[in-house]
Amino acid sequence: MEIHRELDRLSSRRKIDDYYPDEGPHRRGLYVKHCEFFTLGSEHKERCLLGGNRSGKTIAGSYEVTLHLTGEYPAWWNGYRFDRPIRALAAGDTAKTSRDIIQQKLLGNPGDHGTGMIPGDLILKTSPKSGIPDGVEMIHVKHVSGGTSICQINSYDQGREAFQGTEQDVVWLDEEPPMEVYVEGLMRTMTTNGLVINTLTPLRGLTPFVMAFLPDYQPQ
């Protein structure tokens, strides 16, 4: 029984292995759009995964970001690959939603880090988010090369200034950002030729931001 419990514990700290396998309830064949989104990363700097609630958008975003942070790409992966440790920035609407959604997907629940998408044995350390109970601002992740990747968690309500200054290899924006935040994300990846990943439900309708990713729906 102790052996089984230990195996279950270790399995819970490798959650990423449960997603997009060849077979099973989360097999890739059931998530064609997700996989197309991943593949497009090999050709396009900017991408947007639009979908309804509970369609797995945030899971897809956290999955790809984790692969880039760790460098542990599965054999089937035909999206973009980094061959070195990276700097990533992930952000959502508010500090609280970033904690409850992005942080939870990447790390797991507060006090149980390692049960999210980033494998527990690869989380080197985390830094707390000032003023946000149980919030995390920085995640240091062991990269397959032996180096360290860093993921910073921000929120749109911090304003454009919070996104300025640092070069980033990956920017992940979960839910539609203000345009000035999006532009700043592009600026942060300009010198690294990095990726800007958007995962969102178009709750505000066909805004200029959403329409920028829907060229077939542009008025003639």
Language-model segments: residues:
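Phosphate/NTP-binding elements of NTP-utilizing enzymes
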Residues: 1-220
